[in-house]
Amino acid sequence: MTDWKKRWRPPVDKALNYLSLARKAGKLELGEEPVGSAARAQHARLVVVAKDASDHTWRRAKSFVAGTAQECVRLPHSKDQLGAAVGRQEVAILALTDPAMALAFLKALPQPEQYADAMAALDKRSQRIAQRRREEKAHQRNKKMGKK
């Protein structure tokens, strides 16, 4: 058997890998109640709904983010695929709480141009957070060393 046949693996969806990483990092809320509480607390950056989730779930997800700066998208993945990515049976709704992770997730989806509005909003938010981190780091350095 040739080497490439031994090393061949089925294609992996990078977007689902980002969900797995977010779960391990603690930046993911799974299920309707945790997503709702994260959205009400303004912690959810991106609310994600599976393609085969019920219309009621989709309406609830949209109502969670209505009037806020949070984004809501419907994915081309099924509940089973989302569940397998995060280590559950099925997941119909989830929320990413980290804007950089949410942006990387949207960019990894097939046909990311579909989610251009959400990507622009998340990009703006992640840039603002990075700027605040740089300013805080400079402030701490100035407190310690004196302003130059």
Show where each model-derived region lies.
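Charge-patterned, long linear interaction tracts outside catalytic cores
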Residues: 122-148
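Gly/Ser/Thr-rich loops at beta-strand to alpha-helix junctions
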Residues: 52-55, 101
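Mid-chain, well-packed structural core segment of small domains
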Residues: 68-98
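N-terminal first-folded block
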Residues: 14-49
